[in-house]
Amino acid sequence: MEHFDILIIGGGAAGIAAAKACAGAKVLLAERKGKLGGVLLQCTHRGFGINQSGIQYAAQLTKEFPGSITLALNTTVLSVSKEKTALLSGQALGRREVSFSQLILATGCREIPMGALPIAGIRPRGIYTAGQMQEQMNLYGRIPEGPAVILGAGDLGLIMAGQLARAGLEVTVVEKQQRCGAIPRNRRCLEEFPIRLICGDTLSCVHGEGTLQGCTTKKGTYLPCKTLLIAAGLRPERELAAHLGQPDWLHICGNCNTVHSMVEAVVNEGEQAGYAALENLGGTL
């Protein structure tokens, strides 16, 4: 079994920053996708760093990435044990077990799906999380069918509202709070496009067999739509380490620690995790 000083799980902003901070140790970075960058790679909108898109910011982060780090792309970490071993599965590695001295968890967060919400009805075609549609549009050039309804007026919900409106779709945003919670930059789409915003309400039911036809709000408003995006929030994705407790060799950083609104905070946490892991190694290098 090959041993690594530090195992980093996740190749988004936090994982990249952690890897760069602990270069010099024997490091393995496992990323389930085929490229470093995480969710940044599907963000064409600006607002990262100095008015950069997420794609540009990811390119900047990965510039001068340490060649000494073992990079395992298209690799999933299936399990981690309290004995400091991890089971990996990937295209290049196959199914392989490794051991480590320090673990950095940088697995990010995941969207709350429709199945976790109290919305009645079957699940016809046309329902996506906002992030899924962002990926489809920005990476694969797919334009969904309108009209569109978006549940949630946070940052991601309004980013997608603006993007759909720009693509020519009629868009309605439903927000359960009395006002939208997005930052001012992302709220601008409500002024630039004829986007309907319904606050103080939520969805109670979806309609359609085979294909989505519409949805009804809790207050009884029927909204015809062919596309429904769920932007109901994000949850840290740290189930992989839930059974480990809080050992001093585990460092949780970025959005799997707590969901951040600014990528700079994610990068900072990743760097700090890398430095802490390196310090814990002490004289073992």
Protein language model features and the residues they cover:
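Residues forming the flavin
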Residues: 1-285
